[in-house]
UniProtKB/Swiss-Prot annotation:
SMART domains: 7TM_GPCR_Srsx (SM01381). Residues 34-46, 103-123, 202-235, 293-326 are cytoplasmic. The gene is ADORA1. It holds the Pfam family 7tm_1. Glycans are attached at residues 148, 159. It is found in: Cell membrane. The chain crosses the membrane at residues 11-33, 47-69, 81-102, 124-146, 177-201, 236-259, 268-292. Disulfide bonds join 80-169. This is Adenosine receptor A1.
Length: 326
């Protein structure tokens, strides 16, 4: 007999479904926009597509699995472990995509004349592939043995049971907090976030330095170029800020759970942290729509062409790759 759902669980499920209904169409629209608009085909937007793919998977896969775990079905230990690992893979993929975007922006302002020969679409695809492979390695590490099976088996055998343990499937019952804090957070989340902060600080410094230089007659229009780069850096730094704001609370709660086992953790705080982490997948398309004109124009074109059946002005695909707010 399936477990009954409380009013609190029903509210949780309703909010998760709402997040998924915003996240999946929004990020599919991002991928669609890059596909139909040639002006959104440079390396930066390749990394943005990778980020959008991870966000689509959060809405289409992770949130349904989170709802399933919240209901608390009884499953075999390794079945529950397989349900818990996708969120680790997708979180890591998002972090590495954001890091790749930060490095890309740094190279664009550090070596503007050589940028297109250094950062080619082919190399961007190789970088994205490497990021996903690394994400699977990090996210599937609990499947290789760093999990709570030993502790669960002790309790299982102490009760006189045999075979693989059957448990109430919950994330913290199968995923080791040592893994989440020491390996996942301290190695694969916090250092990349700090590195990205340093990279964007350097990007802003280089841009300000160039903008403060006097413009010579033979220099083309560096003020315009670096002005655009400043706008895109601000937009992408905002994406990074929202990611950190969304995911750090959950990792901080994990640290409290590990280092202070006796500390009482209000359940509502855990739910808020979960909502923030899942809600991040719905934020990026909104930021793109408001801050990147080429995305905004392409979104409207897709809407008019495919949903309103009204022709929209054509997007100039021969125009140079768009910068936010340009």
């Amino acid at each position: 007999m399936p477990p009954s759902i409380s009013a609190f669980q029903a509210a949780y499920i309703g909010i998760e479904v709402l997040i998924a209904l915003v996240s999946v169409p929004g990020n599919v629209l991002v991928i669609w926009a890059v596909k139909v608009n040639q002006a959104l085909r440079d390396a930066t937007f390749c990394f943005i597509v990778s980020l959008a793919v991870a966000d689509v998977a959060v809405g289409a896969l992770v949130i349904p699995l989170a709802i399933l775990i919240n209901i608390g079905p009884r499953t075999y230990f390794h079945t529950c472990l397989k349900v818990a690992c996708p969120v680790l893979i997708l979180t890591q993929s998002s972090i590495l995509a954001l890091l790749a975007i930060a490095v890309d922006r740094y190279l664009r302002v550090k070596i503007p004349l050589r940028y297109k020969t250094v950062v080619t679409p082919r190399r961007a695809v190789v970088a994205i592939t490497g990021c996903w492979i690394l994400s699977f390695v990090v996210g599937l590490t609990p499947m290789f043995g760093w999990n709570n099976l030993s502790a669960v088996e002790r309790d299982w055998l102490a009760n006189g049971s045999v075979g693989e343990p059957v448990i109430e499937c919950q994330f913290e019952k199968v995923i080791s907090m040592e893994y989440m804090v020491y390996f996942n957070f301290f190695v694969w989340v916090l250092p990349p976030l700090l590195l990205m902060v340093l990279i964007y600080m350097e990007v802003f410094y280089l841009i300000r330095k160039q903008l403060n230089k006097k413009v010579s007659a033979s220099s083309g229009d560096p003020q315009k170029y670096y002005g655009k780069e400043l706008k895109i850096a601000k937009s992408l730094a905002l994406i990074l800020f929202l990611f950190a704001l969304s995911w750090l609370p959950l990792h901080i709660l994990n640290c409290i759970t590990l280092f202070c086992p006796s500390c009482h953790m209000p359940r509502i705080l855990i739910y808020i942290a979960i909502f923030l982490s899942h809600g991040n997948s719905a934020m990026n398309p909104i930021v793109y729509a408001f801050r990147i004109q080429k995305f905004r124009v392409t979104f409207l074109k897709i809407w008019n062409d495919h949903f309103r059946c009204q022709p929209a002005p054509p997007v100039d695909e021969d125009a140079p790759a768009e910068r936010p707010d340009d």
